[in-house]
Design a protein with these regions (language model features):
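Bacterial N-terminal signal peptides that target proteins for export
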Residues: 1-8
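Short, well-ordered helical secondary-structure segments
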Residues: 2, 86, 123, 130, ...
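Boundary at the C-terminal end of the N-terminal hydrophobic targeting segment
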Residues: 20-23
């Protein structure tokens, strides 16, 4: 076995980083045999199997490595597992792991969970969390030492395994508790989490068995794995996961939009499709959550229904004068029908409207998102171009709701929320303070933002709870905080409050970066199926959450805030990424404008219909065409038009 280059690499890391990260690339081990669902034995040396590391210093703190295995034996070497291990030394309980899209600081909101619903990792003896390469949106794993301030990350070039025993077998990446530290591990197939070996996070509520993920090396076969080791020191100005995220952007450069439709075409088709959802009758008026062919005619505000979005977006986009009439009617209906449902105790209101006149529901996510659209519509109606709109009823509705929300939040006995769902209330409160001249709205917005900043800004903390169907860390929870911080940042800039500008700029950047780690920065490859049929490019799409492991187009909703942060931070990468996210997520849209929610880039089946989930990677579930998959495109296009920006 050739260990010379491995020894040189350890020295190269020290020279390249100039940092104090206590870690090392361990000598390679080869797994032989398979027993009880895992590698039977690890060996340091297999006669005839040469292992060599080729290294390149990329920049301070970053070394590129290509590990090369060559089998010189005369017969196949069977039931083999190849590996890479980078060990970060320290108390395992103080080493906080961050794997984008699946294990955010070990997913502390589900601490102690033992089933397969949400992966967890705290650093206890025997713990591991290892996942398929194709599952990872940003393909890296980082460990941050909460005591010393060091961090280490391993970035990978995701790849399938030649000679894998399982169909569509890929390499895997994860973390494993060790004596005196935690290992970042790359394996040629084996996966597992929550102390369960050889299982895949393949369903919303449970795991799926994934056994016998070994490989066979043929005589003369050469196999290589490319990875980058990044070491440094985290500070409150740049946590380790943020520095790793920035390197991931630089490595994969997810900015190419040449293959995608232009924004004008996208917005027009989405507008045309939105009109097919229009319903107008004695008890209901607006845009339905589901397609009319389903027979379900509910108008639902916020979250998956987005019933208030077109009231803002259609007049701004101004495709036809009839769009203004529909926008007026849709928001007037909300003002008339739902104003009486506003609860004086907390400002929440009913969000589901049925054709028979009944209304129900109401939660911070849906109410906050709806109020933000209504407030943007009120703002636009006050401009010269929006003079054709009468915002009287909208103003009455929004001011009453925001007054009740701010009253509740500003109470001394206000109950601090368990999740970031109430983060979606911040942006409309900020606009309310400006449009209605209500300082109490701004005070409530700052109180909410201050609470979220105190709870979630720091090592080992991850935003969660912005989604209504997952109880874990999720990108929607991070977006809830990011949207609110960014609104407060703009207000601080407008009012020339330098201290608050600095505070909210950092909070917004942190929440944005955590949200962006759910974003695909590389284009995966797929088995035969719908995604391969369309040469689907995954860059710009986003993983939902550690619990819901499919891609969706939700990132489109975040595009305006990302672009504005790119402008504020003078970071052209963010602007280009925002453009990619908008345009890439139009892929798979039918000629009618319909788009389904679930993109199966990895082993995951959200309906859990008991089919073979490992045969579904590369598939596309197009039946769930709820209105947000249309509304977010229109909302983002409208905001960008108001900003005078072409994506």
């Amino acid at each position: 076995m050739k260990n010379t280059n491995i020894i040189l690499l350890a020295a190269a890391c020290v020279l390249a980083t100039g940092m104090t990260a206590a870690g090392e690339l361990l000598s390679p081990e080869i797994g032989m045999g398979w027993e009880n669902g895992w590698v039977r034995q690890w060996k340091d040396n297999i006669p005839g199997l040469d292992v060599e590391d080729r290294t390149e210093r990329v920049s301070d703190g970053v070394v590129k490595v290509v590990r090369r295995w060559t089998w010189t034996g005369k017969t196949p070497l069977e039931k083999v597992t190849l590996s890479v291990r980078y060990r970060m030394n320290g108390d395992p309980l103080s080493l906080k792991p961050f794997i984008p899209g699946i294990l955010l600081y070990g997913n502390p909101s589900n601490k102690g969970r033992k089933d397969g619903r949400v992966p967890v990792f705290a650093g206890h003896k025997g713990e591991f969390a290892i996942f398929e390469d194709h599952r990872l949106p940003m393909p890296f794993a980082v460990l941050e030492n909460a005591v010393s301030g060091d961090f280490a990350a391993v970035h990978i070039l995701p790849s399938p395994v030649q000679g894998g025993n399982r169909p569509d077998q890929w390499w895997s990446l994860g973390v494993e508790a060790a004596s005196g530290g935690v290992d970042i591990v790359l394996l040629s197939g084996p996966i597992g989490y929550n102390r369960m070996r050889s299982v895949s996070k393949a369903h919303m509520y449970r795991q799926e068995k994934y056994d016998n993920a070994y490989m066979t090396l043929r005589p003369g076969q050469v196999l290589e794995k490319t990875f980058w080791i990044q070491t440094g020191v985290w500070t409150k100005d740049a946590f380790g996961f943020e520095q790793a995220m920035n390197l991931s952007l630089d490595l994969f450069k997810p900015y190419d939009v040449d293959h995608h439709a232009p924004v004008g075409k996208i917005a027009r088709l989405k507008r045309d499709y939105a009109l097919t959802r229009w319903i107008e009758g004695p008890n209901l008026c607006g845009f339905t959550q589901r397609e009319r062919r389903t027979g379900r005619k509910d108008v639902v505000l916020g979250w998956t229904g987005c019933g208030a979005t077109c009231g803002y977006a259609l007049p701004v986009l101004d495709f036809d004068k009839s769009d203004w009439e529909k926008a007026q009617k849709s928001l007037d209906f909300i003002g008339d029908r739902l104003v009486g449902t506003i609860r004086s105790s907390d400002g929440m209101f009913n969000v589901r409207c049925k054709v028979d006149g009944r209304t129900s529901g109401g939660d911070p996510v849906s109410c906050g998102q709806s109020l933000y659209c209504i407030m943007k519509a009120i703002r636009f109606a006050g401009k010269s171009g929006g003079g054709r709109l009468d915002a009287t009823k909208w103003r009455t509705f929004a001011s009453r709701a925001l007054d009740a929300i701010s009253d509740a939040v500003l109470q001394e006995d206000w109950r601090e929320p368990a999740s970031t769902a109430q983060g979606f209330l911040v942006a409309p409160l900020v606009l309310g303070s400006e449009i209605f001249n209500r300082p109490e709205h701004l005070a409530a917005a700052k109180k909410l933002a201050g609470f979220f900043g105190k709870r979630y800004f720091g090592i080992g903390r991850a935003y969660w709870g912005g989604s209504l169907d997952a109880k874990c860390e999720d990108k929607e929870g991070a977006y809830a905080a990011f949207q609110g911080y960014e609104a407060l940042l703009r207000h601080a800039v407008k009012t020339k409050n330098k201290s608050e500008e600095e505070k909210y700029a950092r909070l917004a950047q942190h929440a944005m970066n955590m949200m962006l780690t759910y974003t695909m920065v590389w284009n995966s490859t797929y088995p035969p199926g719908r995604l391969a049929d369309h040469a689907f490019k995954s860059m710009g799409w986003t993983v939902v959450s550690p619990q819901n492991q499919h891609l969706d187009a939700f990132g489109v909703m975040t595009v305006p805030e990302i672009w504005r942060m790119g402008d504020y931070l003078n970071d052209w990468r963010l602007k280009k990424l925002a453009s990619l996210m908008y345009r890439s997520c139009f892929q798979l849209t039918s000629q009618s404008g319909a788009l389904g929610e679930s993109i199966q880039h990895t082993y995951y089946d959200s309906p859990d219909d008991r089919r073979n989930v490992f045969e579904q990677r590369g598939g596309y579930r197009e039946g769930w065409t709820v209105f947000w998959l249309t509304a977010h495109f229109l909302n983002a296009a409208a905001e960008m038009k108001e900003m005078g920006v072409e994506l």
